[in-house]
Design a protein with these regions (language model features):
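Residues that form generic nucleotide/phosphate-binding pockets
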Residues: 20, 33-37, 52-55, 79, ...
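A contiguous, basic/glycine-rich beta-loop/short-helix subdomain that forms a polymer-engagement track
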Residues: 77-111, 121-130, 255-362
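Signature of the SF2 helicase/ATPase Hel1-core->accessory helical subdomain module
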Residues: 84-112, 116-253, 353-362
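A substrate-engagement module of RecA-like helicase motors
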Residues: 1-111, 183-191, 321-322
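Generic amphipathic alpha-helical segments used as scaffolds and interaction surfaces in large
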Residues: 36-46, 55-71, 90, 94, ...
C-alpha cells in the first residue's frame, strides 16, 4: 500500500469551507472564528465553495487542491486552507473527517510514502507526519538538491518592526490575562504574573526598538533596502541584543506552550467556543515566539557546521508602510543533516544522476 504526503496548505480546511459555503452570515460564536476573512466575496464564490463542500461531503473529492476540476484562485485558496497556527487540531469539530488528518492517518498505515524533500525535512524537524524514523527506509531521489532544500528549510526570518512588535506583545499579555481570568491553570507559571510578564515584555520591546535604530543606520532612510553583514559577523552591540532576545523569546515560547497544553486539556469541561478561540490565539502566539526564538539563536551563532551563518536585514514596503525584517541561514548544513537524517534514520539511500563525492562521480 502506498500514498503521497502533502503539506497542510495543499488541503482544504473543512471549518473554513463550511463558513465560505454558507449562505447565512458567519455565526462567529458557533464556529469560534477569529478575525479570519471567512465570508465569500460574492455569490459566485459562495456557489463554488458550496459545490466543493458537496463534493467533499459525498467523498467525490479528497480535499486536496490538485484533485478537483473546480478552478480555485490563490486568494480563495488562502481562505479555504489553513496553517499550523490556525488549526485547532484534535479540538476541532471537523477533526475526524478533516482531509489533512485523514491523509495523515493513511500515512501511518502505508508501506510506501511519496513526499518531496521539503516535506521530509519539515517532518523530521517537527517529528510529525512521517512514521517513526527508526522504522524508515528513506530513499532520496535527486539527492544533489538536498543541501539547497535543507538550507531553505532552515532559513529563519521574522518581522521586527518596532510598532508591530509592540502590538504583538500587548496582544500576548492580554491573552495571558484572559487565560488567567477565565481558564486559570492549577499551577501558575511565575512568568504569567502580570508584573513580571509586563517587565519581561518591556525589556524585549526596548531591545527590539534599539535593534531597529541600529539596523536602520545601515540602510538608506525611507525606502526599501537590504544590508548583509560581511561573513555573518554582527557588531558586538547587535550580537549582545540577539543573545538576550534569544533568551527572552524562548521564555515566552515556553509560557505560550504551557498555556496551550493547559487549555487543550480543558476542552471537556468549559465553554467550548471561548476555549477554542483562546486555543487558536495562543497557538498563533506560540508559532510567532517559536520562530523568533529560532531566529535569535541562529543569529547568536558565529558558525554553523564549521561555516559562517549568513545574516541580513531588509526593509520592505507593504500597503504604504515600511516593515523591517531580520534573516539568518547557515551556509553549510551538514550538522543539521546529520541531526535530522543521518543519525535519526537507520537506512537511507541517496540517488542522483549528478551526485558527486569529493568531486568525482565514481
Amino acid at each position: 500500500k502506498f500514498t503521497a504526503a502533502f503539506g497542510r496548505g495543499r488541503y482544504v480546511c473543512p471549518r473554513n469551507l463550511t463558513a465560505l459555503a454558507s449562505t447565512e452570515p458567519t455565526q462567529q460564536d458557533l464556529l469560534a472564528f477569529l478575525d479570519d476573512e471567512l465570508t465569500p466575496n460574492n455569490q459566485e464564490e459562495q456557489k463554488r465553495c458550496a459545490k466543493l463542500k458537496g463534493d467533499l461531503d459525498t467523498y467525490k473529492w479528497d480535499g486536496l487542491r490538485d484533485h478537483t476540476d473546480i478552478a480555485i484562485d490563490d486568494d480563495l485558496w488562502r481562505r479555504l486552507s489553513t496553517d499550523k497556527a490556525s488549526c485547532l487540531n484534535r479540538n476541532c469539530y471537523y477533526y475526524r473527517e478533516c482531509p489533512f488528518f485523514v491523509a495523515r492517518r493513511e500515512i501511518q498505515e502505508a508501506e510506501v510514502v511519496v513526499a518531496n524533500h521539503a516535506l521530509v525535512m519539515a517532518a523530521m524537524e517537527s517529528e510529525a507526519v512521517l512514521p517513526d524514523p527508526k522504522n524508515l527506509l528513506l530513499v532520496l531521489d535527486e539527492g544533489h538538491h538536498l543541501p539547497d532544500v535543507a538550507r531553505d528549510a532552515l532559513e529563519m526570518s521574522a518581522e521586527i518592526t518596532a510598532p508591530w512588535y509592540r502590538l504583538q506583545l500587548d496582544l500576548f499579555t492580554k491573552l495571558v490575562a484572559t487565560c488567567m481570568e477565565q481558564f486559570r491553570p492549577k499551577t501558575i507559571p511565575p512568568l504569567a504574573i502580570p508584573e513580571r510578564l509586563n517587565a519581561h515584555c518591556e525589556e524585549l520591546y526596548e531591545l527590539i526598538a534599539s535593534l531597529n535604530n541600529i539596523l536602520n543606520l545601515y540602510m538608506p532612510a525611507g525606502q526599501e533596502a537590504e544590508h548583509r553583514f560581511a561573513m555573518g559577523e554582527l557588531p558586538d552591540e547587535v550580537l549582545e541584543i540577539c543573545q538576550r532576545l534569544a533568551k527572552l523569546t524562548e521564555m515566552l515560547r515556553g509560557l505560550a506552550e504551557l498555556f496551550l497544553n493547559d487549555l487543550s486539556e480543558k476542552t471537556g469541561s468549559h465553554d467550548i467556543v471561548r476555549l477554542h478561540r483562546l486555543i487558536l490565539q495562543m497557538n498563533r502566539a506560540l508559532g510567532m515566539f517559536e520562530a523568533q526564538s529560532k531566529l535569535w539563536r541562529l543569529a547568536s551563532l558565529a558558525q554553523s557546521s564549521g561555516a559562517p551563518v549568513t545574516k541580513w536585514a531588509t526593509r520592505e514596503e507593504r500597503e504604504g508602510q515600511l516593515h523591517l525584517w531580520f534573516h539568518c541561514v547557515g551556509i553549510r548544513v551538514s550538522d543539521q543533516l546529520e541531526r535530522l537524517l543521518w543519525r535519526s534514520i537507520p537506512h537511507i539511500i541517496v540517488t542522483s544522476a549528478t551526485l558527486r563525492s569529493l568531486n568525482s562521480f565514481s
